C-alpha cells in the first residue's frame, strides 16, 4: 500500500478550525486510482489542501479512504463541489472510481472539550 501524507495542524492559517474533506469509495484497483489521484496534485494544492491521508481498509484492496485537510470548511466544500460536478462525472477523469463516493466535510471538535 502506498502512503501519502503531509503534516497537518489543528488550527488553520486563517485562525479557524481545520476542515477535513473525508471521502471513501470502491475502486477498480489501486494503481489506476493512484494514477488519477496523482494527476490532480496541482488541483488539490491550488484548492488549499494542507494535508492528505490516503488509506485502505485491511483486507480490502478495492476500497479507498482519504482525508484532505483545508484551512476552513468553505474551501473544503468548494473542492467537494469540484469533485462532484467535474471529476466524478467523467470516467476519463476518474478511471479508478468503481462506485458512488461518499464525501463529507468535517471539523475537529475543540480538543479542550475532550477528556
Residue ranges and their predicted role:
Residues 17-21:
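Short structural boundary motif marking the start of a folded domain
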Residues 22-23, 45, 55, 62:
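Generic signal for short, ordered secondary-structure residues
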Residues 24-26, 67-69:
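Short hydrophobic/aromatic beta-strand micro-patches
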Residues 32, 63, 75-77, 112:
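Intrinsically disordered, low-complexity acidic/polar segments
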Residues 34-53, 69-104:
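An amphipathic, aromatic/His-enriched active-site/gating alpha helix that lines ligand/cofactor pockets
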Amino acid at each position: 500500500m502506498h502512503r501519502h501524507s503531509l503534516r497537518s495542524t489543528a488550527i488553520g492559517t486563517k485562525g479557524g478550525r481545520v476542515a477535513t474533506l473525508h471521502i471513501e469509495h470502491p475502486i477498480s484497483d489501486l494503481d489506476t486510482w493512484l494514477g488519477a489521484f496523482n494527476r490532480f496534485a496541482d488541483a488539490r494544492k491550488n484548492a488549499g489542501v494542507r494535508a492528505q491521508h490516503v488509506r485502505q481498509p485491511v483486507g480490502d484492496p478495492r476500497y479507498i479512504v482519504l482525508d484532505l485537510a483545508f484551512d476552513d470548511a468553505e474551501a473544503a466544500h468548494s473542492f467537494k463541489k469540484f469533485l462532484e460536478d467535474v471529476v466524478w462525472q467523467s470516467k476519463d477523469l476518474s478511471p479508478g472510481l468503481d462506485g458512488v463516493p461518499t464525501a463529507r466535510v468535517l471539523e475537529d471538535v475543540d480538543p479542550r472539550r475532550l477528556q
